[in-house]
């Protein structure tokens, strides 16, 4: 188990090709001076300064998690206290998950007690700069009933003046297995963080403060049979943001504060069935509704609204997997996605897997990814543009993996080529003054990723990974070379 409060540092070390930014001892923040930008293979990293992550999708139990107005993930909301494990798909996954899954997908699978009993864990840590992190978790399993309750409090003064960060929140999940084949569960997560941004050393800020509340709740009914399984689920995410954009030395304090309320709700259904030997067919449908309101609240009582907008997405998809021979599997899928502003997008994907002797496998895949423009890009703040079209890319990938020595040794190598268009960037307005969001950017990336791990015994293991990335049009927060190596020790309570 990780002692980090956020899942991002763990992914930074263990996933080749993934990179996220950070700014201090603890916390990422939002808006001006924020970090927590994420990229996979150079997708998701901002093409220009001050743009958020929008090309990489974060999920919790398969449900998309992003700010309803801005369309970007909130890094401080993805805490290890709720995570049983984190699944990462490198490369486009839009055929299953839709918009934003261009560079890949991070899926946080929430905790659940698997065996009967009661387990309680308390973690307390302290460090320099007045840093404290605490977490308490209680998990129960009694017959068909299960529950998980977690609370945490973390704070730091920061390594610079005016860089304090404080966060507290809780997570609860209840589940009940009606039968061996049907189960239901629901959960809720609420976190509150207060952050301060001091600006850069050369360009400091005064009173650049944030008070952010994020919440999510979901409900799912699942079925699991020998030849079919599926789920019907509902989720609702919300956020309340209060931001003082601050001022620079010699300037005047702002006479207003930025406020926003955003929401995202959705209903998802899928069913997977084995029609005959070596076959798996999955069909599914999604409905998403997202949006909110943003305004500047002035001290004299009046307010100026910058956005009050909601949009909808409806999609259906199918994925077909078939063993053609003992050594060959075909996987093909397609999604039709309708957005209430930008219209319909068709997303195909196809792949082949070659099963070789000695637990070796070669995979070849071609997949399309896309991202719809956000409400911020279309309707909020100059240079907004309501005529924007979706960003699109194609990813071509070849991979090799193998497990040896009773699975104690594992290694893999991926090579990929990505080509995309319609990247949304700010350029001079061709029909007027100022800047305008336009579909003028291009993506052409290629690279390689390698990973290796070895389990000496139940106590000791080692792992390493490396990624190389070439970008014809470089973006921020996407390093060319990334290397990690680690030694793991786990025994009893240690």
Question: For the regions a protein language model found, what residue spans apply to each?
Answer:
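Short strand-turn segments of transmembrane beta-barrel domains in outer membranes
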Residues: 105, 109-140, 150-151, 156-163
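Extracytoplasmic beta-strand/coil segments of soluble accessory domains associated
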Residues: 11-63
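Repeated loop/turn-to-beta-strand initiation elements of outer-membrane beta-barrel proteins
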Residues: 144-148, 181-186, 225-231, 278-281, ...
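Gram-negative outer-membrane beta-barrel transporters
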Residues: 323-326, 415-419, 438-494
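Flexible loop and strand-edge segments within Gram-negative outer membrane beta-barrel domains
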Residues: 156-163, 167, 181-264, 303, ...
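Short acidic/polar hinge/loop motifs at secondary-structure boundaries
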Residues: 8-12, 55-56, 63-90, 433
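Transmembrane beta-strands of outer-membrane beta-barrel pores
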Residues: 124-128, 142-144, 153-157, 190-194, ...
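Membrane-embedded beta-barrel scaffold of Gram-negative outer-membrane proteins
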Residues: 144-145, 227, 231-245, 292-293, ...
